[in-house]
Curated annotation (Swiss-Prot):
<dbReference type="InterPro" id="IPR050117">
    <property type="entry name" value="MAP_kinase"/>
</dbReference>
<dbReference type="GO" id="GO:0035556">
    <property type="term" value="P:intracellular signal transduction"/>
</dbReference>
<dbReference type="InterPro" id="IPR011009">
    <property type="entry name" value="Kinase-like_dom_sf"/>
</dbReference>
<feature type="active site" description="Proton acceptor">
    <location>
        <position position="231"/>
    </location>
</feature>
<keyword id="KW-0808">Transferase</keyword>
<feature type="domain" description="Protein kinase">
    <location>
        <begin position="74"/>
        <end position="398"/>
    </location>
</feature>
<dbReference type="GO" id="GO:0106310">
    <property type="term" value="F:protein serine kinase activity"/>
</dbReference>
<keyword id="KW-0723">Serine/threonine-protein kinase</keyword>
<dbReference type="Pfam" id="PF00069">
    <property type="entry name" value="Pkinase"/>
</dbReference>
<comment type="similarity">
    <text>Belongs to the protein kinase superfamily. CMGC Ser/Thr protein kinase family. MAP kinase subfamily.</text>
</comment>
<keyword id="KW-0418">Kinase</keyword>
<dbReference type="GO" id="GO:0005524">
    <property type="term" value="F:ATP binding"/>
</dbReference>
<dbReference type="GO" id="GO:0005634">
    <property type="term" value="C:nucleus"/>
</dbReference>
<keyword id="KW-0067">ATP-binding</keyword>
<keyword id="KW-0547">Nucleotide-binding</keyword>
<dbReference type="InterPro" id="IPR000719">
    <property type="entry name" value="Prot_kinase_dom"/>
</dbReference>
<dbReference type="GO" id="GO:0004674">
    <property type="term" value="F:protein serine/threonine kinase activity"/>
</dbReference>
Amino acid sequence: MDIYYILNHDNSDNNIFDFENNSDTIDIGKNYKKCNGQGQMLPPPTLITPSNQNDTITYYTDGRSISVPRKMLIDPNTIVDCGTNGIMFIAFNFETQKRVILKKLSKRMFDNELNGHRIIRNLIFQNLFQGGKHISTYQSIFKRKCSDSYQPPLTSILNSIISSNDNPQQHSTLIQQKDDEDFYFESIQPQYSLLNLISNNMLDQDDICQLFYEILMGLKFMHSAGVIHRDLDPENSIFVDENFNIKFTEFNNCFLLDTDPTFLFNKEYITNTYSYRAPETIWGDSLYTEATDVWGAGVLFAELLLGKRLFRSFNSKEHLKSIYKLIGAPKASEGAYVVKGELLFFLMEYNRKNSFQPTFNNTFIGCNQIQIDLLKNMLCWDPRDRYSVNEILESPYFENIHDRTNFIPCDKNLNVNIHFDILNLKPNQMTNLIDQEFLNPS
């Protein structure tokens, strides 16, 4: 195994990916230096060939090691932390000739069983949805041994503890230990996140219609497998490729309808923001249905039309107030069905103390009547009153692009036994499961 140190780069230097697409070799010598046993810097082998592209090569940066196949050319300017147990970076895959995102996760990530469960759930649903037109799955999953130990800066550890509200005693400061086996997850680098397109006003009315249509078709595909997505976040879960196609990613919040118990829906439902969560998911033991995703799709449609966020909610009460201000108070029967206990009391008290008109009409003053009708029938308190995905697709809004014959449902069956066993798996069992079920051959 060769070991290299990533040299400091000027952010404007993009030469790391200078190469001829039809070449069998890539020169990486100008970006990295090798260190021999005496600490002397030596030039690395400058040729990547089909015969050596899967050899392990280890790079050091800021005290951490990244061990990848030689065919992965790392862009050192893109290395970022993703929690205390992982880093993420962009690389060029010489074999596929594509820029990719690699996420490196320490096996220690699985010491936190909740994190481990979410990783396994993501892999299970990726396998289920693989091949779907609007699905982006990992291109490969591999593991490599650490070449050295690494302890992150104290500020990084403290920030992680504060942001996660975990017990500090549960955190290990030694995140990477020599000879630990780290997992690497490779995915195609998307052209844009959906949020990029929304917030930068890059879309005309035809673009909005097409993207919203593709969001609905992606949901219809997942729903055909009896699964709801639950986390329609345009920043982290939905991307747009170079051909302007919607791609769904991150399936760790997916919920198996008619099979998953309701307690599981709430037990491990962790999203980055409340802004896309349907009101019935905030509290309660309702029967969750595809209508949960219809609410999220309605929020996305609103944001596509407005060119900005619809809600900015970071806790349950704040989110319920934001919904209340937009569409008004729920009827008594709706409120009791959607929220329970303390939150129902909070909502009724908030309604009693506040008297103002909903902002819906003013918010969407620039939209046409067809768009307004869709929004009203997606963004409603009671999930039983929302349009289904099929009803939305039959709207005149899509009359020029909807092709009823062009839908291919998910034809795979979920391995329910593995799915149910997730909650009972211990850290070593989770890593063994990845080895057995998901790891690419070395």
